[in-house]
Design a protein with these regions (language model features):
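Long amphipathic alpha-helical segments used for membrane anchoring, targeting, substrate engagement
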Residues: 1-30, 79-98
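Residue-level signature of catalytic and energy-coupling elements of molecular machines
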Residues: 10, 44, 69
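N-terminal intrinsically disordered, cationic/polar leader segments
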Residues: 29-50, 57
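A short, polar/charged loop-to-alpha-helix boundary motif
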Residues: 57-66
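Stable alpha-helical structural segments in soluble proteins, enriched in small hydrophobic residues
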Residues: 68, 72-80
């Protein structure tokens, strides 16, 4: 394979990698835990936080609600990580692309 063909192949791989990254970044992932629903972008920036309760939150329920937020956020982030690995993992062992 000549040098020009190698460079062309590397450019195509880089384009594919950027397309995969853009797809992950623009995807919205949802994490939920009982009363809490969190939406995050693939960039791990939080899009929205919802508390699904028609009842007022009592003072003694605050710690439980905080735990629900942690579970929901971590769940959404795990989904981001999983999709990132699925989309970007094939590029991990290619030297010079990062």
């Amino acid at each position: 394979m000549n040098m020009q063909a190698i460079l062309k192949q590397a450019q195509n791989m880089q384009k594919d990698m950027m397309k995969a990254k853009e797809e992950v970044d623009n995807t919205v992932f949802v994490g939920e835990s009982s009363l809490v629903k969190v939406e995050v972008y693939g960039t791990k920036k939080i899009k929205s936080v919802k508390i699904n309760s028609t009842e007022p939150i009592e003072a003694d329920e605050i710690e439980m609600l905080e735990d629900m937020f942690l579970v929901a956020i971590n769940s959404a982030f795990e989904k981001v990580d999983k999709m990132t690995e699925e989309k970007m993992g094939k590029f991990a062992n290619i030297p010079g692309l990062f």
